[in-house]
A protein has these predicted regions:
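Active-site environment of divalent metal-dependent phosphoester hydrolases
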Residues: 15-19, 52-56, 88-97, 154-156, ...
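Active-site-proximal segments of metal-dependent phosphoesterases and phosphodiesterases across multiple
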Residues: 56-67, 172-216, 224-227, 232-235
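Extended active-site neighborhood of metal-dependent phosphoesterases/phosphodiesterases
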Residues: 1, 59-173, 201, 227-282, ...
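Active-site neighborhood of phospho(di)ester-bond hydrolases with catalytic His/Asp-centered motifs
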Residues: 9-11, 44-50, 82-90, 148-149, ...
Length: 437
């Protein structure tokens, strides 16, 4: 499996919102140009919804306006170069039109979860595939991307979708959720009733499911939250530098990182509200179109946001996963502590794994791999022989193999030699081999 990928993230292009489709297309195309120049090896594009502005004010008699806006979005030549993932924004799901689903092909789209009432689409609502209505997911390399339709306010549906999708994709390193309506933003939408419903409902679920990062749009402003811990709010982790600025790197955070993307076209910007939200780590509004570059590896997920005018950095955040515990590589098990492989210091190392409640030996002769079915001489406790079974666990008590019967101390694991008193009985073991006589 490949472990490195790059994708580009764009907040609401909302073509047509400024009143000039041509101007909005120009801004959108310019941002795409800058993004692809910054990350020429990007693997795909990800739009946070509201690709167009049409909304529900246009009925079936005025679909030409809607199509002109879609043309303004899709005619950007860069969209022919890479796959494009989109979200259903509130401006995309207008009454009496199912055009969103007719313009975008979405993988693994649910016909059970994330549905909006058919009334929102009038007589054109047929199924999820034709409307683009419904939660969906895709995987790329080591990452699972789950896209929720936040025009649907059923928390139960979104929860079921997330749980079933995660269960069906157990071997990913990163879990990303994306949806249009930002629940941790700094613009005026954040206090509206639908956003409050989504925030109160989704936040604890996303934390419980171990989601790493949430990508959002809707508010045409840039905002990055602190690491959020669901119902308990911000996690207890220290999240500021000594000078009070927000951290730009966190390791093994106990919570979820939320990022809200600014407009990618410049068709509309919102003001940052006067209210100071305690969950906000970074906020920015310069009325300059933004784009974000996400770089994903096995150990780190970095999102850096840039201004499309000069490619200067607005903000960056890196989430690192420092390995702790066992990791299997090429059929061998290795033990990590704070991301550092143990047992490679020129001599072996005994470690205790609380999850299995057992002791193991890391064999320096095998680059720190777990010793299995092996007798090991350890210099601790004045020197002792210890045996590890086929699972690598230290053997304690009586043990028999093809050579004979042995006894290992129930606390230290030391092989018995000579005459030993065991449970009130005198036992004699070979001084050299430890075999019971």
């Amino acid at each position: 499996m490949l472990f490195r990928s790059t994708f580009l993230i764009f907040g609401d292009p909302q073509i047509g919102c400024s009143g000039s489709i041509d101007d909005d297309n120009g801004g959108w195309t310019n941002t795409l140009n800058h993004a692809l120049a910054k990350a020429p090896n990007a693997n795909f594009l990800f739009s946070m919804g509201d690709q167009i502005n049409a909304y529900y004010k246009y009925d079936t008699s005025n679909l030409s306006q809607v199509e002109e806006e879609y043309d303004g979005f899709l005619n950007a030549p860069q969209l022919t170069q890479l796959p494009l993932a989109t979200e259903l924004g509130n401006h995309d799901c207008g009454y009496n039109t199912a055009l969103y689903g007719q313009h975008f092909t979405l993988p693994n789209i649910s016909e059970k979860y994330g549905q909006v009432s058919g009334d929102a689409y009038g007589d054109n609502a047929v199924d999820s595939e034709s409307t683009g209505d419904g939660d969906y997911y895709f995987t790329y390399n080591n990452t699972l991307y789950m896209v929720l339709n936040t025009s649907c306010l059923s928390i139960a549906e979104h929860k079921a979708f997330l749980e079933e999708t995660i269960q069906a994709n157990p071997d990913v390193t990163w879990k990303v959720v994306s949806f249009h309506k930002s629940i941790y933003s700094v613009a005026s939408h954040v206090t509206e009733s639908d956003i409050v419903t989504l925030r109160n409902g989704l936040s604890p679920i996303l934390s419980q499911l171990g989601i790493d990062i949430v990508l959002q749009g809707h508010d045409h402003v840039y905002a990055r939250s602190y690491i959020m811990g669901g119902e308990s709010g911000m996690t207890a982790d220290v999240q500021k530098n000594a000078d009070g600025s927000a951290l730009t790197e966190v390791t093994n955070p106990d919570g979820v990182q939320y990022i809200t993307m600014n407009s990618a076209s410049g068709s509309k910007f919102y003001k940052i509200t006067e209210e100071a939200f305690e969950y906000t780590a970074v906020q920015n509004q310069e009325k300059v179109p933004n784009y974000s570059v996400a770089n994903v590896t096995k150990d780190a997920f970095t999102v850096t946001t840039y201004r499309s005018t000069d490619d200067s950095v607005v903000d960056t955040i890196t989430i690192k996963k420092s390995k702790n515990g066992w990791e299997t590589v090429d059929g061998k098990d290795y033990w990590y502590e704070d991301g550092v492989k143990q047992g490679t210091e020129g001599r072996g190392k005994e470690i205790y794994d609380p999850e299995s409640d057992a002791w193991y030996w890391l064999d320096s002769d095998a680059n720190g791999a777990k010793a299995v079915s092996k007798d090991v001489y350890q210099e601790s406790d004045g020197g002792k022989w210890v045996r590890y079974d086929a699972n690598g666990q230290m053997i304690k008590g009586w043990n028999t193999n093809e050579n004979g019967t042995y006894y290992f101390d129930p606390i230290t694991g030391a092989m018995a030699h000579g005459t030993v008193e065991i449970n009130g009985k005198t036992c004699h073991f070979d001084e050299a081999t430890g075999i019971l006589k």
